[in-house]
Structures are given as structure tokens and as C-alpha cells.
Amino acid sequence: MSIVGIGTDLVEIGRLAALQQRYAVRFTERLLAPAEQAGYQASAHCDRKAAAFLARRFAAKEAAAKALGCGIGAQARLTELVVTHTTAGAPCLTMTGAARRQANRLGVRCAHLSISDERDHALAFVILER
């Protein structure tokens, strides 16, 4: 396999908390795919956990879009970049719609995702291989 794309993103958790407070449901619906909503709802009881959840997802999606070489927009919508976890807890990236088509154009066969967060920031790193 060879690497076709690498992307990383660093997000300030407080910025996502402010967006969530300002736009509420509209923001989460624009950011999260239906498969991600349950994870968000599980953390929604605590503002800090909810903001960290959203920041991790946003960082992962931005990193994935950068690895695809297109950024967030017509070729990769936020809800088309889906972050879930394996039963062991490892993060997984799935692409649908236009994001999947962009990945297919690049010949992507495998996506590797790493996500981390600390008190104030969330970080994600994506490697795409063909």
C-alpha cells in the first residue's frame, strides 16, 4: 500500500462549546452523521464532555478532508465523514456520498484515524492509503 493523503487538525474545545451553545441542534445536525448522534447524546449530560466529543469529531473530519485534498465543502461534507469506534474502542473513519467519490478517485482503500484530546484542545490525524 502507498500513502495517498495525510491530514491533521487541532481544535480548541471552547470554540466548539461556544458554537454548540449558540446554534444548538442545528450545529450538531450539520456536524454529525446519524451514526454519530448516539455517541453525542451519551455525552450531552455534561457540557464539557459534549464539547470535547464535538471537538474530536470536528478535528477528525477536518483532518480527513485535508487528507482527501479537498477540504470541507462540495467534495466532502461534514456528515459524509463518519467517525465511529471498533468494539475495542479504536476510532474508525467511514466516508459516504461525495467524500467517498473523492476517496475512490484517489484510489483510497484504507483510512487510518487517530484522535486525542486534552483539557483545551482536540487533535486528529488521518492517513489514507491505496
Predicted regions, residues:
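Core catalytic alpha/beta fold that binds nucleotide/phospho-ligands
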Residues: 1-130
